[in-house]
């Protein structure tokens, strides 16, 4: 009986414990579910609420393992965020589970594992390159520059591309864009405006060698000089080392278009010669094209990589009389186009515009040579009887890959049946094909180029219905592939670290600069561009092209610079961290650029350093001063330690200068171009002032009813030329936001494929050439900043030529631009009242002056009043006995003043020029000490050069001859 009672007691206790345990676990389950239902990620906007998938309790080990869905993995993980998650969830668990060790698994990993190496206290060495490192010669190196970075991206090879591009759609039997035409662009064009003018140059100025699987040159002309079929343009000279035909086939172009599976690099021959170390007797191959148009052309060389190829083949590019030399490692990358650089070339056929290759080398071996290509050109790949009719640069990578000699399997895995899918895959396939056989992809066959990182720059879809909030950025990686390993054996988590860094730093940098941006998800999913590359890779969806608040930033060139610099800095840090090396961020461009005479024929050139408050290491340690004489191109620069330099001028020769800042991390972008001229007989000096620094999006419409960009009101002005416009926006109706068929932002296509000139920052040169043509005056120049900060005293000069271009405070630009700041007004008023002669020209001289004080300045100092805008279609002006035209329509040659000021004289000033419709275009005034000539359009926009010269001579005669 006692045994029975004991048994019943134990049984009842067990049942009670089990019941209590079940209740506790049910309560725990509710707590976990409630935690996830209310969870808000810190710093990340998740499109979907994360949820718990399952949990596992081990009462013996006192552990609780929670498995969450993939959305939980998409947020940012830092040590602090991870610690907070565990602290919060344990605080909500009932007893006894709040004392258990909790672990959260999402996407197959603990959240601790999702902390990137750069933030982790215990870095995961499997994600690092370790002892894998390329220390041979780079694929291409400019050996003419006086400066090389040592703590940047030197000898690092990167594969980088802008998304999408024009493609042939087999389903509709037409060429089309891969993404919709919204807000005057399409993703196929928009992302190039980040990558081409900003990101690639930043990386290259830090020392990187950048491969891009889409054509990078927006030049629509293309000239190919080849040993096959270019009799007058290709010349061989044999002095030491005979030129012979290589055993492998080479490039040869045929007339007409190219069909599927045609490889131009298998159609011809290439040449080779044994090397020599002699500096006196060597053999040369010369490629001298006939340029139909002067302009900027990318230069691509090609060759064969043979067993005894050398790593230091010497190429020289002669560009408008200057020469720049490159060493090319021909042991890699044979049988394709190899980019050297982009240069200015004259029209015509002469020895000052050519490329040469010698057989000089420090090694015994051979150099090989094949075709040389100048310019990006037009698409020439025919699909089902049609070419795109567009510049090659805006086509998809599939077509460039064929033109670049890639195997058929690389660019047409679908055997010509699906160009859309092939274009997605070819970017990564090219990366692997070129990088195969290098230390970073040792188990692939390929061209041995040590590409160690792959990055795709995209924009995304999505918007908020309120039309106000930023949609933001998203990044993508793929870790669950090939057992989580890349080709060299390192963990694919290296790609997640890259994607996380890109996303985190974009948000950090944009918030710092503009006080707003959104971090969206970090996808770890199966995307071709993040799965296929056998090196760390990521896709960065920079913003939404469907969201007007995003694109209001995205269409501003200053924003694109900031975004590109953020990406560059991320790659700089990431690549150096992967190798355990230190790095320095490249500096920003100098400001307050100015040139003044020190004595009669020596100029003092000076500038100021600009520090980046975000980057303490980016301070300049020196500068490169670039010089061009007359119509020649700029030289390769002179290294200057200080912020000034003196140059002795040759009489009668115009000099043009620009400056960049350098440090051990790399080189900044350049300043604007300034000019100087010494005329021994001159008794007067003209100071040219550059007041045109504006880069801007088109005019913005943003109200309760409308959103978008109005190119007719103001097309804005890009940094240099652009291929980024598809057409004018048609639909501004906010109620049609998100409508896929012609909804808000829908745009026309009249501008697609058209190169549109922007602000080249070289208009002082245009003014200087016109003044120098008079042969009467000395010339110096400065930025308007140098006047506003008191670094230049205008009283020293007989005349001031203030060029304002399209400068104005437009109300929507992210940077502040003003034709006449209060400081500049004060300086000009003082100068004019003290007898200085003043020439002012610009499209917004009057219309940018809106306050009573500003209009008083117009009337009292510039002797004019603003009388409206002129949009006379002809762009014709009459004045000084000359009828001439100015650039007033968007074009490839020069920025356009599409709308200009009507300036009426304030008596006793008088009308000096008129537009075709009879409205006043310029005023002149001379009385007492004051002498003025004010133009309502930019002088540099006058199309005819000789008429520019005559007009400038007439203006200066009026201003300076008593």
Regions found by a protein language model. Give the residues of each.
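A glycine-rich, often tryptophan-bearing local segment used as a flexible ligand/cofactor-contacting loop or short
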Residues: 802, 806-913, 947, 951-953
